[in-house]
């Protein structure tokens, strides 16, 4: 009985991944892979295949810990939270994709126009950060993978 209680307590205190990441809800300088986001806040989830979820998680934690610009705040189960430069980065690893949320700590003014090629109004710094992270880990946005399969 005592062993069962100790096990229950240990499981209750073990780090838990959230079921999902919170939405940007119109915040400036925030992107998310939540499909309900407005287009200027949406970025496709990242696929980590052919890696397993455990390997993808280990690689991501290692990369973020080794990056001098990042401080890992939480790495529970399949969830990672880090402060990278001026952004809070959250990664939630599902079976075959990584969902994410990247939000600036200090919100800036989002201009109502773009001056860069392929710009989507707002949150370009956060888009570049998550795409660079994915590239370094060998992950790709699921929409680019799907488009490549159709070509």
Task: Annotate each language-model stretch with its function.
Residues 1, 8-12:
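N-terminal chloroplast transit peptides
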Residues 3-5, 119:
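Generic alpha-helix initiation/capping and coil-helix boundary signal
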Residues 13-151:
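Ser/Thr-rich, low-complexity intrinsically disordered terminal regions
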């Amino acid at each position: 009985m005592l062993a069962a209680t100790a096990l229950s307590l240990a499981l209750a205190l073990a780090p838990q991944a959230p079921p999902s990441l919170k939405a940007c809800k119109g915040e400036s300088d925030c992107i998310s892979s939540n499909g309900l986001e407005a287009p200027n806040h949406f970025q496709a989830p990242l696929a980590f295949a052919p890696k397993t979820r455990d390997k993808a998680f280990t690689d991501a934690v290692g990369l973020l810990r080794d990056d001098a610009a990042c401080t890992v705040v939480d790495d529970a189960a399949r969830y990672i939270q880090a402060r990278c430069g001026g952004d809070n980065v959250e990664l939630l690893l599902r079976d075959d994709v990584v969902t994410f949320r990247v939000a600036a700590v200090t919100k800036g003014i989002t201009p109502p126009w773009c001056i860069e090629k392929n710009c989507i109004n707002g949150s370009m710094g956060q888009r570049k950060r998550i795409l660079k992270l994915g590239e370094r880990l060998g992950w790709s946005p699921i929409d680019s993978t799907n488009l490549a399969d159709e070509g």
